[in-house]
Regions:
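Conserved protein kinase catalytic core
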Residues: 13-14, 41, 145, 204
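Structural motif
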Residues: 3-7, 31, 136, 178, ...
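Conserved acidic residues
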Residues: 2, 59, 242
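Residues immediately flanking
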Residues: 8, 36, 140, 199, ...
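SF2 helicase catalytic motif II
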Residues: 1-17, 28-38
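Short, conserved "post-DEAD/DEAH" coupling segment immediately C-terminal to helicase motif II
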Residues: 14-28, 46-51
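Conserved helicase motor core of P-loop NTPases
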Residues: 33-177, 181-186
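Conserved nucleotide-binding/hydrolysis modules and their immediate coupling elements
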Residues: 13, 150-252
């Protein structure tokens, strides 16, 4: 008997789940795994939550967290938010994995984010500002949205390289980039993170590295790539990073 395991099921919408169920053989078992406290799917429906609340299938809830220590401020803050409470935003008394940085307006927030990514986090924790630190935004638009922060961080962290501009986006050698569509021919998929190795204007090609594998894009194919110094929280679901900076503004 076959078993199909679907992870990150909170991202699955109604149409995709219907297609999956139609394709599943009658004698196959289906195990769905996910977190109902994550953002819902971009498409319609709340499949995972509805399946759990239906009472029609056995449900096992995992409550122990192994990714962080039990006393992690990330974990304690997440639990308080889930319970509808404000997390502890005060400065930590000792070494911590969660910090709150105050900013009174979007312009100040952007300046603080840039300082954190470029200087403070690399100096304090020894992390690479491009490969190890990810800015995650609630939205693309706005002064502290992913689009503008990508432009700001790209200019500061990776200026004056060979570049190509397509669709209002600039791609430079050394950039962090994200694939935003599934490409089965290139074997790169929506949400994959890579790094630009080379931009060749003569050949009209960009070469990027995804987990040690070289992928070539013609300049006409760059609409499937975006700079990824900053990304939306939706696009980052299922990923993990050594350090994350999240702007939380009233405009969000």
């Amino acid at each position: 008997r076959n078993l199909l395991v679907v992870d990150e099921t909170s991202m699955v919408d109604v149409m995709l789940m219907q297609s999956l169920m139609k394709a599943l053989p009658d004698r196959a078992a289906l195990l769905i795994v996910g977190d109902i406290d994550q953002l819902p799917s971009v498409g319609p429906g709340q499949v995972l939550g509805d399946v759990i609340s239906s009472g029609a299938v056995p449900v096992l809830r995992l409550t122990d967290v192994f990714r962080q220590a039990a006393q992690s401020r990330i974990i304690m803050s997440a639990h308080r938010i889930n319970q509808g409470s404000i997390p502890d935003l005060g400065p930590p008394e000792a070494e911590s994995d969660f910090y709150f940085v105050q900013a009174d307006d979007p312009e100040t927030a952007v300046a603080r984010i840039i300082e954190l990514v470029k200087t403070r986090i690399p100096k304090r924790f020894g992390l690479d500002p491009i490969r190890d630190i990810q800015v995650l935004c609630p939205m693309n638009r706005g002064d502290a949205g992913a689009d503008q922060l990508n432009r700001d961080l790209q200019d500061l962290l990776n200026p004056a390289q060979l570049e190509v501009e397509r669709g209002g986006r600039v791609f430079r050698a050394g950039d962090k980039v994200m694939q935003i569509e599934n490409d089965y021919d290139k074997e790169v998929y929506n949400g994959d993170i890579g790094y630009v190795d080379d931009v060749d204007p003569d050949a009209g090609e960009l070469k990027a590295n995804f987990d040690g594998r070289a992928v070539t894009y013609g300049f006409g194919e760059l609409d499937t790539l975006v700079p990824a110094y900053a990304a939306t929280i939706h696009k980052s679901q299922g990923s993990e990073y050594p350090a994350v900076v999240i702007p939380v503004l009233t405009q969000h």
